[in-house]
């Protein structure tokens, strides 16, 4: 996706299309090498959500959409390689903190920290989007993304009943990609946002709504349905 956003400045469109097709071919080849040790259910109907969407985890999944939507909007409005690396650096720091502390055991605090850090990064980006401030913003957004997405994934893995975790993880991946691609499409199209500043303001709004929705509904839903 990042290559697609920044590729036209490096390669002509036809070569980008050939590159995309080649990567799709590599993906298809690698998929054929995957061996699944479980037998698929027999006598399934023509249309089925089995192994595709788990409705029990849909509410946390919809709440989780705020994370990839914000990330997609920001990446579409800020085509800077060092900014992307700063986001990756923030996420790596989250992984280290997760191993060294017990903060991951408190989901409510984890999501709160994640959204607040993301908000801080967006505000910095809104005020100054160049120089050291840009890298600090990317680091905060990456760190906040790690905190938020870490707990949302944990919820979607713990909520399923027996033998449903694969479907739940598939739901997580589907919603993550849907949110990211939708955010890119909306931000790049120009139908909703005409300037980068408007994109950042929209991302701030999405972040606030995601935090409030978690505190008011998702956290309570998880406590009521966990291990039922």
Task: Go through each PLM region and give its residues.
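Transmembrane alpha-helical cores of Major Facilitator Superfamily
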Residues: 1, 85-89, 170-178
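Transmembrane alpha-helix termini and helix-breaking/packing motifs in multi-pass membrane transporters
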Residues: 2-15, 182-197
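Symmetry-related core transmembrane helices of the 12-TM Major Facilitator Superfamily/SLC fold
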Residues: 14-34, 198-220
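Flexible interhelical linker loops that connect adjacent transmembrane helices
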Residues: 27-61, 225-228
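Extracytoplasmic gate region of multi-pass secondary transporters
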Residues: 53-92
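Transmembrane alpha-helices of Major Facilitator/SLC transporters
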Residues: 83-107, 111-119
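C-terminal transmembrane helical hairpin of 12-TM major facilitator-type secondary transporters
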Residues: 106-152
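A late C-terminal transmembrane helix in Major Facilitator Superfamily
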Residues: 160-195
């Amino acid at each position: 996706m990042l290559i697609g956003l920044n590729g036209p400045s490096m390669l002509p469109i036809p070569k980008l299309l050939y590159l995309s097709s080649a990567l799709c071919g590599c993906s298809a080849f690698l998929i054929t090498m995957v061996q699944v040790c479980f037998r698929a259910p027999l006598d399934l109907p023509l249309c089925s959500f089995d192994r595709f969407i788990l409705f029990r985890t849909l509410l946390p999944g919809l709440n989780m959409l705020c994370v990839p939507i914000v990330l997609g909007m920001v990446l579409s409005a800020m085509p800077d390689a060092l900014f992307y690396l700063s986001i990756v650096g923030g996420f790596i720091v989250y992984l280290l903190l997760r191993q060294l502390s017990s903060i991951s055991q408190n989901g409510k605090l984890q999501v709160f920290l994640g959204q607040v850090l993301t908000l801080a990064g967006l505000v910095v980006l809104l005020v100054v989007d160049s120089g050291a401030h840009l890298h600090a913003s990317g680091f905060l957004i990456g760190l906040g993304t790690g905190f938020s997405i870490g707990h949302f994934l944990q919820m979607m893995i713990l909520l399923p009943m027996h033998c449903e975790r694969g479907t739940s993880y598939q739901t997580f991946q589907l919603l993550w990609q849907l949110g990211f691609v939708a955010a890119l499409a909306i931000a790049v199209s120009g139908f909703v946002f005409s300037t980068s500043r408007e994109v950042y303001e929209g991302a701030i709004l999405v972040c606030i709504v995601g935090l409030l929705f978690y505190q008011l509904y998702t956290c309570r839903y998880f406590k009521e349905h966990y291990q039922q």
